[in-house]
């Protein structure tokens, strides 16, 4: 049911923003996802009202982290549970054009769709996608850079600051760490740098960055694996 659920959410979002591209809609759904999972344990709360007892069903939740429940981290839960209501006003979106996908495919020598432009450089990690992942060699130090560009779809005059969530296995930095937008539709670029000392074989490490202006929280998951 995940596919029709996401398709319905995208159609719902399109009614509010008919001029948005498919990549903008996808970005809005991904970056506003809720990184909480409902508890499998169900508890009941009984309260006495007048002469009757009223039963309340209580569901608990906890953050989606790389724990023994979700030991594969972001690989297991991705961008989280989509929230179509929050996606209506995502604040920022990552837009990806057809030319960006062609460049990405050409960089990995896939050209069944036609002729690749000469001198194409880059790699899949350069695709302006709302998430970031990299395969690194095990037991070796590494540094990976992810260039990204976001578009302000909110009002003018907003300033976003980057917050990094990571663990001791990798270091994540964002430059610049502050983005100020003078107008709606304005674009700003930044680079996310992920580095580490050596990860054992078959290791998956999760992190994330969140751009926040105090109202909007634009979250992008990061995965490094060997």
Predicted features and spans:
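Loop-rich non-cytosolic ectodomains and luminal regions
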Residues: 1-226
């Amino acid at each position: 049911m995940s596919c029709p659920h996401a398709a319905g959410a995208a159609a719902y979002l399109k009614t509010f923003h008919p001029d948005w591209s498919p990549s903008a809609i996808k970005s809005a759904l991904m970056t506003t996802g809720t990184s909480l999972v409902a508890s499998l344990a169900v508890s009941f709360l009984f309260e006495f009202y007048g002469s009757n007892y009223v039963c309340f069903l209580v569901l608990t939740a906890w953050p989606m982290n790389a724990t023994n429940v979700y030991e594969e981290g972001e690989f297991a839960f991705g961008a989280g549970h989509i929230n179509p209501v929050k996606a209506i006003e995502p604040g920022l979106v990552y837009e990806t054009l057809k030319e960006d996908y062609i460049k990405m495919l050409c960089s990995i020598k896939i050209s069944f769709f036609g002729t690749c432009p000469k001198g194409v450089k880059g790699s899949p990690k350069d695709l302006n996608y709302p998430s970031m992942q990299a395969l690194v060699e095990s037991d070796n130090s590494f540094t990976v850079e992810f260039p990204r560009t976001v578009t302000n779809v909110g009002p003018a005059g907003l300033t976003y600051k980057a917050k990094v969530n990571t663990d001791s296995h990798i270091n994540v930095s964002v430059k610049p760490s502050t983005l100020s937008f003078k107008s709606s539709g304005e674009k700003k670029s930044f680079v996310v740098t992920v580095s580490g000392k050596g990860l054992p074989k078959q290791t998956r490490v999760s992190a994330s960055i969140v751009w926040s202006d105090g109202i909007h929280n634009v979250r992008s998951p990061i995965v490094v694996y060997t």
